[in-house]
């Protein structure tokens, strides 16, 4: 896909960190080094023009964007040509790293900021990621459209909103039998306690909650699985902004 050395991409140290972190996750990232290096270069190129991410240092990007995104693969949810939604993708995380390592996934990356969507579109094009597309819009609107409502096998969101809000935004996108993963930091217990009744209203239930450490940094992370057990009632999601202002729990 790429040829020759890209001096604007990952340094030798950055590549070594990525390989080491991947190994800690049980992943061989050597075949994907050039793609991650080019993605890093694209982030650096765009950072002066668009406020994509607060993380710009090489080690920060490798650990807190690339490897953090790939912690999703610790869950046994990604086998086969699944249709996956990345909600609130920002600069393409976790969706782009997930797609690089699992190219068979059909991926839709959604964000409500047009400039971020434009960046993700460019990254998809430059990296040659077939079966991936970026989409501008709000979850509350898209989840009511025929091509999106109950149309996905998996959905993911990283640091978008509290679980009570995320549940209402994610579950309507899932087919019955599908699963969403909310990527959370060290403190998740307070969000989990009131969640089950809200999930039941949405046709969901709480699945696995996987505690893990971010490779290289040791920071605590939690992957919260929300399972789609029944169709989501037509009333959900509510109008844009309402889930945040009046969460279900």
From Swiss-Prot:
Sequence intervals crossing the membrane: none
Official protein name in the record: Ribosomal RNA small subunit methyltransferase G
Matches recorded under InterPro entries: rRNA_ssu_MeTfrase_G, SAM-dependent_MTases_sf
Keyword Membrane appears in the UniProt entry: no
Residues annotated for S-adenosyl-L-methionine binding in this entry: 88, 93, 111-113, 139-140, 158
GO MF annotation list: rRNA (guanine-N7-)-methyltransferase activity
PANTHER family according to UniProt: S-ADENOSYL-L-METHIONINE-DEPENDENT METHYLTRANSFERASES SUPERFAMILY PROTEIN
EC number: 2.1.1.-
Natural source organism: Thermus thermophilus (strain ATCC BAA-163 / DSM 7039 / HB27)
Compartmental location: Cytoplasm
Function: Specifically methylates the N7 position of a guanine in 16S rRNA.
Family: Belongs to the methyltransferase superfamily. RNA methyltransferase RsmG family.
Pfam families to which the protein is assigned, alphabetical: GidB
Major enzyme class: transferase
GO cellular component terms given for this protein: cytosol
Gene: rsmG
Alphabetical keyword list: Cytoplasm, Methyltransferase, rRNA processing, S-adenosyl-L-methionine, Transferase
């Amino acid at each position: 896909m790429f040829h020759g050395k890209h001096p604007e991409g990952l340094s030798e140290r950055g590549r070594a960190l990525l390989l080491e972190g991947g190994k800690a996750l049980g992943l061989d990232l050597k075949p994907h080094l050039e793609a991650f290096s080019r993605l890093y270069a694209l982030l650096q190129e765009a950072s002066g023009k668009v406020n994509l991410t607060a993380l710009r240092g090489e080690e920060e990007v490798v650990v807190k964007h690339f490897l953090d995104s790939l912690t999703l693969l610790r869950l046994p949810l990604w086998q086969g040509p699944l249709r996956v939604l990345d909600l609130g993708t920002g600069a393409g995380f976790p969706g782009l790293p997930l797609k690089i390592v699992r190219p068979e996934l059909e991926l839709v990356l959604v964000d409500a900021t047009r400039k971020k969507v434009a960046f993700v579109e460019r990254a998809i094009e430059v990296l040659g990621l077939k079966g991936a597309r970026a989409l501008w819009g709000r979850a509350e609107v898209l989840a009511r459209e025929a091509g999106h409502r109950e149309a996905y096998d998996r959905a993911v969101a990283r640091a978008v909103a509290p679980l009570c809000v995320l549940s209402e935004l994610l579950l309507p996108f899932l087919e019955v039998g599908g699963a969403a993963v909310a990527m959370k930091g060290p403190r998740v217990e307070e969000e989990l306690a009131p969640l089950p009744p809200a999930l039941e209203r949405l046709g969901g239930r709480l699945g696995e909650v996987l505690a893990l450490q971010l490779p290289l940094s040791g920071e605590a992370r939690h992957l919260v699985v929300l399972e789609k057990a029944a169709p989501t009632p037509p009333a959900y999601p509510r109008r844009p902004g309402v889930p945040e202002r009046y969460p279900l729990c």
